[in-house]
Regions:
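Conserved AdoMet
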Residues: 1-42
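Active-site beta-alpha loop architecture of Rossmann-like, nucleotide-cofactor-dependent enzymes
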Residues: 7, 125, 176
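Conserved beta-strand segments of alpha/beta enzyme cores
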Residues: 19, 73, 98-100, 191-194
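Short glycine/threonine-rich catalytic loop with a Thr-x-Gly-x-Asp
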Residues: 29, 57, 199-202
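Conserved SAM/SAH cofactor-binding pocket of Class I
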Residues: 35-131
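Short amphipathic alpha-helical segments
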Residues: 88-89, 130-133, 156, 182-184
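Mobile active-site "lid"/loop adjacent to the S-adenosyl-L-methionine
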Residues: 122-151
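Conserved Class I SAM-dependent methyltransferase catalytic core
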Residues: 147-209
Length: 211
């Protein structure tokens, strides 16, 4: 058991005020990721808005939002069947009924102008990132993206098509990636691009709007 994160040993992890089942098929939720849910709550999006969590993993982001805003229609996608199995356990544990899981590569299933909000904590570490050695027990496909920013480009391109007018997108990103992700969002056509910091004061999330 040496080196195995305690959350995997106990099969439980805390996120916001909720507890989630986790195992090595999914990432362990991070405190900084809670900021995505908190910011989405701040958006005060309309009742019955359609939301997609891209690369849902354990489902902690989508399920937390589903419980805090039961009036929303929430979808959560992942390419990993293993991750979707874990997310299914968490949906059942929390008895969430305003959420649906979809096996999909990013937003490939989404129809044009069908979504009000896209949120994602995608893979954003480069394959040579020095932090990976400390994350050896976690699924590398959920951590690593070519060049570190390829996932942001692919999701942003697809999201711009899938979002309705005035729809929003929000990402968690690495602390040194703000300028790169800002440029990607701008190149994809997004406006009102705003960045935010985590509790340590590091650039950690960014959101934008389709206008």
């Amino acid at each position: 058991l040496e080196g195995i994160p305690l959350d995997y040993i106990l099969n439980t992890s805390s996120f916001l005020d909720f507890t989630f089942y986790v195992d090595p098929r999914v990432l362990i939720p991070r405190p900084e990721t809670e900021l995505i849910v908190e910011k989405v709550i701040d958006f005060a999006i309309n009742k019955n808005a359609v939301v997609l969590d891209v690369g849902t993993g354990s489902g902690c982001i989508a399920i937390s939002l589903a419980m805090l805003r039961p009036d929303l229609k929430i979808f959560a996608s992942d390419i990993s069947s293993d991750a979707l199995d874990v997310a299914t356990i968490n949906i059942q544990n929390h008895q969430v009924n305003n959420m649906q899981l979809i096996k999909s590569n990013w937003l490939s299933y989404a129809k044009t102008e069908s979504l009000d909000l896209v949120m994602s904590n995608p893979p954003y570490l480069k394959s040579d990132d020095r932090h990976l050695k400390d994350l050896a027990h976690e699924p590398q496909t959920a951590l690593v993206s070519p060049k570190g920013t390829k996932s942001f480009l692919e999701i942003s391109q697809q999201a711009f098509i899938a979002l309705k007018h005035e729809g929003r997108i929000i990402f968690e990103h690495g602390f040194s990636q703000r300028l790169e992700v800002t440029a990607i969002l701008k190149d994809c056509g997004f406006k009102n691009i705003i960045s935010g910091q985590d509790l340590q004061g590091l650039d950690r999330f960014i959101y934008a709007q389709k206008l």
